[in-house]
Amino acid sequence: MIQMQSILEVADNSGAKKVMCIKVLGGSHHMVAKLGDVIVVSVKEAIPGGKVKKGDVYKGVIVRTKTGVVRPDGSTIKFDKNALVLLNKQDEPIGTRVFGPVTRELRAKKYVRIMSLAEEVL
């Protein structure tokens, strides 16, 4: 579960390395974000020459969490780190590649484009 002030890694090649959550979208009582939720983030670390700069504010969709997700068959998928993919104003991925695995739960949230860019879908 991701809340305000959480530090996440960026799983795409947009140029950002680490971001901090500054707002969880989805209503006034939405305090934590889970897999597939959209949050507003600020870039804390970026590589030189990337598409994004340090201090920029973007939306991002969460693709991996430490708390994981429980599937209807009872299995649980957890990851070592929290990660997201940065989105532009039209809610499309900024990067052209997604590093690491993503989960099938993104399909229900209408993020098929991220699934097609990913190396592996669990």
From Swiss-Prot:
SUPFAM superfamilies: Ribosomal protein L14. One of its GO terms (cellular component) is cytosolic large ribosomal subunit. One of its GO terms (molecular function) is structural constituent of ribosome. SMART domains: Ribosomal_L14. Keywords: Ribonucleoprotein, Ribosomal protein, RNA-binding, rRNA-binding. It holds the Pfam family Ribosomal_L14. GO terms for biological process: translation. InterPro entries: Ribosomal_uL14, Ribosomal_uL14_bac-type, Ribosomal_uL14_CS, Ribosomal_uL14_sf. CDD domains: Ribosomal_uL14. The keyword GTP-binding does not apply. Binds to 23S rRNA. Forms part of two intersubunit bridges in the 70S ribosome. Part of the 50S ribosomal subunit. Forms a cluster with proteins L3 and L19. In the 70S ribosome, L14 and L19 interact and together make contacts with the 16S rRNA in bridges B5 and B8. Belongs to the universal ribosomal protein uL14 family. This is Large ribosomal subunit protein uL14. The gene is rplN.
